[in-house]
């Protein structure tokens, strides 16, 4: 699309016929700045008149042609004859009334202004061509864009980028058919930002006689009998409007008639309101009263009430061309949404009760259920709508009335407050009238609100701190009592344990010596053999002593269950470990408090707790946190150094890491992505390959995550296949089902996949819907309207695609935030588990150390205190959380 222009100056000082030929001299063409030119190309593609559209007429408010360009041409008589219209409708000359003469002038003596020249547009005050585009015309309602074309040639190099952004936003801000006052405010804004455009010429702005309708002329000339405004430049236009701000002409629209009143920003996401059921509170109570008049002890009466409940409400209450009703006469005229799931559940419950046998429910029971339905508006006031509430909640604007957004929001809040205060009284009145005073609703206690206005700030004395001191002293006394009782409990355990001498010695020398008989004393005290040296690669933990190992454990004391745990760890079967860990942890907790070698039991309990969390994360989410894996490997090295054996194929931590890397579910997710990116036969081929892989993997042993991936992948591919093969008349529910399944798939498996086939179907459906709304019309004028509607539908389609892309971006941001939260949880959970178990073992180990019989009381060295963390901790404050969940800047 080339942006060509014409520049040929003729300054005659009046509207008289020029003394010089208009087309005798060659024209000179100016070139816009590169950024401005590219912006105009984008605006032209969106808002140009279609090449096959009828560009020779302007429609009036009645939908009929009100004028034709090139009025002095040879086609005018034929045009009037074809329309069978009176000649007064398309007359060429017209007297300029007094009310319009303040802005407009009579130009009947200058017939060349009404001729099409296919070269340029004219300026009004001086007959000279204006720089404008000549290869196309703007669509109906966007002719005002021609005013800003001459301004583009006056912009300096420094302001080129700013003016480009101004042009890019201009059609979206003003929309189609703006008022003359809106054009005036836009010009003032442009002058403020770009002072160099003040002297720029503008094309003629013409007004239709007797109608508040304006048109910015182009190369087609002026419509017949229309009056040009008394301005030919930006400066004269602003001065003319400024001197007549009180004129009613400023409310006139610039452009031809629109396509009727409608919700401006209605999109496909609002279409569900068309089929939703609504009912006013008055009609609901009236219907329920009629139901209560029926004999509910008979089957016929119950069937009649059932039919009444099934027919409640109306549909098609609101749509794009039909505004939500505005007859608001108290709370009884509010509309209740019956299609809501909460309301539907209550209605279904009553309907089921009506369909049951007569013996199950008496008539009084059914009357109570029906009376309870009268409280639906009071229990669900959030789905009660007035016009203000409906338009505010759905962000809808009627017929480009964007200036009413603030008042709609304010009035919606007023309606909400009124509903919350009056719905309870309506329900009480309904119950009293329908039950003849037998039932009563408990009235809420009124809350008196007082407002105190202080002329001066209230002076208050210094607060007393004695109550804080008293709380501190009481807390200290209670803590001392608890500590004293706990120490007494530990002493009682020591005395009791030392009185028993029933456990034999268990040597760990490594020789083949058999244990001594029960009556003899051991040859040497139990402990670690000096010939057993820990490897250098073992990571030592300062919270455990060197004598806490498997060789120091009395297996007779520990019992068979602990031996089974040791055997399970040696076998390394993750499924068996996952089932045995909860019971083993409870046994280990008992052994920590009542058996010798409690340090080793604490270490095993720590390992099993961390391993259980890791196995659960692996089976459910196919996830293995690096922090959890490192913690498991550290404890495994310590347990291996203390005599616990693991499977030769690898430790449980190694098996989990290998399982994550070779996950069947992850492989299927990648295959699904490859299938979703394809279309046509490639999609079907890749889908068949994926389904074959799923059928082969079903025979193997799978985790819960793998099974979930298989089920979701099979269901998603089946839904997409159904949407591709179904008839176009039944496409909408199947396409919505497939898109919903794809969204659930992305949420479950932390992906952001999109289906090329579904996007193509959605675009095709929107295009077919737009073409279906166009239809066929018998006249050329209606064809122009149809083409205009197609252009509007295409514009709506582009905006919906942009909205869909914005939704995808927001979902990606939500996935990123979720991954960050999961990462923080995976890091903190194993650390907290390790700290809690280790601190419990260290706290309880003090009483279990004295259980060994026959040992003299010697002063034992003070063990190193257990510390869960050695460095400065991270503070999880609201500031950090706010930084994590802060909305990214766009």
Swiss-Prot record:
Taxonomically, which superkingdom? Answer: Viruses
- What are the site positions for Cleavage? 255-256
Molecular functions (GO terms): cysteine-type endopeptidase activity; structural molecule activity
The UniProt keywords, alphabetically, are: Hydrolase, Protease, Thiol protease
Q: Identify which top EC class this enzyme belongs to.
A: hydrolase
State whether keyword DNA repair applies: no
- Which EC numbers characterise this protein's activity in its record? 3.4.22.45
Q: What does the record say about PTM?
A: The viral RNA2 of bymoviruses is expressed as a single polyprotein which undergoes post-translational proteolytic processing resulting in the production of at least two individual proteins. The HC-pro cleaves its C-terminus autocatalytically (Potential).
Reaction catalyzed: Hydrolyzes a Gly-|-Gly bond at its own C-terminus, commonly in the sequence -Tyr-Xaa-Val-Gly-|-Gly, in the processing of the potyviral polyprotein
Q: Which residue ranges does the record annotate as region Disordered?
A: 507-533
Domain Peptidase C6 as annotated: residue spans: 135-255
**Where in the sequence does UniProt note compositional bias of the Pro residues kind?**
515-528
Report the record's Gene Ontology biological process terms.
Answer: proteolysis
Catalytic residues, chain numbering: 143 (for helper component proteinase activity), 215 (for helper component proteinase activity)
InterPro entries attached here? HC-pro, HC_PRO_CPD_dom, HC_PRO_CPD_sf, TMV-like_coat, TMV-like_coat_sf
State the family named in the UniProt similarity comment for this chain.
Belongs to the bymoviruses polyprotein 2 family.
What this protein is called in its record is: Genome polyprotein 2
Source organism of this protein record: Barley yellow mosaic virus (strain Japanese II-1) (BaYMV)
């Amino acid at each position: 699309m080339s942006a060509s222009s014409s520049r040929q100056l003729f300054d005659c000082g009046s509207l008289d016929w020029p003394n010089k030929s208009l087309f005798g001299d060659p024209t000179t063409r100016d070139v816009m700045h590169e950024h401005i030119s590219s912006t105009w190309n984008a605006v032209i593609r969106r808002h140009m008149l279609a090449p096959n559209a009828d560009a020779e007429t302007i429609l009036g408010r009645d939908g009929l042609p009100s004028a034709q360009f090139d009025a002095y041409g040879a086609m005018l008589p034929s045009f009037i004859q074809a329309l069978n219209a009176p000649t007064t409708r398309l007359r060429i000359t017209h007297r300029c009334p007094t009310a319009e003469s303040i802005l407009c002038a009579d130009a009947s003596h200058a017939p060349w202004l009404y001729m099409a020249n296919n070269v340029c547009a004219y300026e009004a005050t001086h007959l000279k061509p204006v720089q404008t585009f000549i290869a196309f015309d703007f669509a109906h309602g966007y002719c005002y864009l021609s005013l800003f074309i001459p301004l583009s040639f006056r912009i300096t190099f420094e302001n080129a980028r700013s003016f480009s952004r101004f042009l890019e936003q201009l059609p979206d801000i003003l929309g189609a058919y703006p008022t003359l006052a809106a054009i005036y405010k836009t010009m003032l804004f442009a002058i403020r930002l770009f002072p160099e455009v003040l002297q720029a010429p503008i094309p003629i702005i013409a007004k239709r006689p007797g109608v508040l309708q304006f048109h910015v002329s182009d190369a087609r000339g002026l419509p017949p009998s229309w009056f040009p405004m008394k301005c030919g430049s930006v400066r004269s236009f602003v001065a003319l409007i400024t001197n007549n701000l009180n004129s009613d002409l400023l409310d006139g629209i610039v452009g031809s008639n629109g396509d009727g009143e409608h919700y401006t920003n209605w999109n496909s996401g609002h279409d569900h309101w068309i089929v939703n059921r609504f009912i006013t509170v008055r009609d609901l109570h009236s219907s329920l009263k009629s139901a209560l008049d029926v004999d509910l002890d008979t089957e016929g009466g119950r069937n009649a009430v059932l039919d009444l409940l099934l027919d409640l409400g109306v549909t098609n209450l609101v749509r794009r061309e039909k505004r939500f009703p505005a007859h608001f006469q108290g709370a009884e005229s509010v509309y209740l949404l019956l299609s809501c799931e909460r309301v539907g559940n209550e209605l279904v419950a009553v309907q089921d009760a009506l369909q049951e046998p007569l013996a199950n429910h008496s008539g009084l029971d059914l009357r109570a259920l029906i009376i309870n339905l009268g409280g639906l508006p009071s229990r669900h006031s959030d789905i009660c709508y007035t016009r203000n509430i409906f338009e505010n909640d759905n962000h809808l604007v009627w017929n480009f009335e964007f200036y009413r957004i603030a008042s709609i929001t304010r009035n919606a809040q007023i309606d909400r407050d009124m509903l919350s205060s009056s719905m309870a009284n309506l329900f009480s009145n309904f119950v009293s009238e329908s039950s003849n005073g037998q039932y009563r609703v408990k009235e809420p206690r009124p809350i008196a609100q007082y407002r105190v206005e202080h002329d001066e700030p209230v002076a208050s004395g210094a607060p007393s701190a004695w109550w804080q001191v008293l709380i501190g002293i009481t807390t200290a006394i209670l803590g001392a009592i608890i500590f004293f009782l706990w120490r007494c409990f530990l002493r009682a355990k020591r005395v009791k344990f030392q009185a028993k001498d029933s456990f034999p010695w268990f040597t760990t020398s490594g020789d083949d010596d058999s244990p001594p008989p029960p009556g003899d004393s051991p040859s040497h005290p139990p402990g670690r053999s000096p010939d057993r040296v820990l490897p250098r690669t073992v990571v030592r933990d300062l919270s455990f002593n060197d004598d806490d190992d498997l060789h120091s454990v009395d297996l007779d004391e520990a019992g068979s269950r602990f031996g089974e745990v040791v055997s399970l760890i040696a076998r390394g079967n993750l499924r068996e470990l996952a089932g045995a860990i909860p019971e083993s942890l409870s046994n280990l907790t008992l052994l920590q408090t009542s058996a010798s070698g409690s340090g080793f039991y604490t270490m095993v309990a720590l390992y099993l707790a961390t391993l259980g969390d890791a196995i659960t994360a692996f089976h459910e989410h196919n996830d293995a946190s690096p922090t959890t894996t490192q913690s498991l490997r550290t404890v495994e090295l310590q347990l291996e150094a203390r005599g616990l054996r693991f499977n030769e194929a690898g430790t449980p931590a190694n098996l989990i890491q290998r399982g994550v890397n070779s996950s069947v579910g992850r492989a299927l997710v990648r295959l699904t992505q490859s299938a979703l990116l394809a279309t046509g036969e490639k999609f079907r081929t890749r889908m068949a390959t994926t389904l074959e892989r799923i059928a082969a993997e079903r025979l193997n042993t799978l985790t819960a995550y793998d099974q979930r991936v298989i089920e979701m992948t099979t269901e998603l591919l089946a839904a997409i296949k159904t949407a591709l093969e179904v008839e176009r008349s039944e496409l909408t529910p199947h396409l919505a089902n497939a898109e919903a399944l794809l969204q659930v798939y992305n949420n479950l498996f932390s992906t952001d996949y999109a289906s090329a086939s579904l996007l193509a179907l959605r675009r095709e459906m929107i295009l077919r819907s737009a073409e279906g709304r166009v239809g066929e019309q018998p006249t050329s004028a209606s064809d122009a309207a149809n083409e205009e509607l197609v252009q509007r539908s295409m514009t709506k389609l582009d905006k919906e695609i942009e909205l869909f892309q914005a939704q995808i971006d927001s979902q990606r941001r939500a996935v990123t935030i979720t991954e960050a939260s999961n990462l923080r949880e995976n890091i903190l959970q194993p650390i907290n588990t390790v700290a809690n178990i280790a601190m419990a073992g260290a706290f309880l180990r003090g009483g279990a150390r004295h259980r060994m019989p026959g040992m003299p009381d010697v002063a034992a060295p003070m063990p190193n205190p257990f510390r869960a963390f050695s460095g400065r901790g991270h503070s999880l404050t609201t500031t950090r959380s706010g930084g994590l969940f802060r909305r990214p800047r766009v």
